[in-house]
C-alpha cells in the first residue's frame, strides 16, 4: 500500500505538534511537511506529491486557509483538504463546503475522529 503524504498547515506550535502526532499514528501516512501560513500551501503542492492537507482556517499573518484551499482545489483537485478550526462558526463550514473542502474537523474533537 502506498504511503499517503500529508501536509499540515497550522500556525500554533502545540496544535501543529498534535496534528503531526495524529498523522504518525496512521501506519500508511506520513507528514510531508508543515507550514505556518496558508498562503504558502499552494506553492508547496507544486513542489512535490501531496495527498491530503490538514488546513487551519486562520493562520499566521492573517493568512486565510479557506482562500488557500479554494486555490489549491482549482489547480490540484485530486488533493483532499480537511479544514481545521477551533471556531464553531457556521459561516466557516458553509464556505468550506462551497469551495470544495473534503471535510471539516474541530480541534476539540478526539484525535480518533481525525485518524479513525
Provide a role label for each language-model segment.
Residues 34-52, 60:
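Acidic, metal-coordinating helix/loop segments flanking the phosphotransfer/catalytic sites
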Residues 54-69:
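Conserved phosphotransfer microenvironments
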Residues 10:
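Conserved acidic carboxylate
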Residues 43, 66-78, 98:
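Short amphipathic alpha-helix used as the core "switch/output" element in two-component signaling
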Residues 13-33:
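Two-component/phosphorelay signaling modules centered on CheY-like receiver
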Residues 91, 109-116:
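C-terminal output helix
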Amino acid at each position: 500500500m502506498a504511503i499517503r503524504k500529508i501536509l499540515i498547515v497550522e500556525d500554533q506550535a502545540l496544535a501543529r505538534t498534535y496534528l503531526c502526532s495524529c498523522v504518525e499514528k496512521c501506519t500508511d501516512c506520513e507528514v510531508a511537511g508543515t507550514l505556518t501560513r496558508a498562503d504558502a500551501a499552494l506553492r508547496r503542492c507544486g513542489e512535490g506529491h501531496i495527498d491530503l492537507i490538514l488546513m487551519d482556517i486562520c493562520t499566521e499573518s492573517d493568512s486565510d486557509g479557506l482562500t488557500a484551499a479554494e486555490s489549491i482545489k482549482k489547480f490540484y483537485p485530486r488533493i483532499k483538504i480537511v479544514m481545521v478550526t477551533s471556531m464553531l462558526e457556521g459561516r466557516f463550514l458553509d464556505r468550506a463546503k462551497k469551495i470544495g473542502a473534503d471535510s471539516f474537523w474541530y480541534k476539540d474533537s478526539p484525535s480518533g475522529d481525525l485518524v479513525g
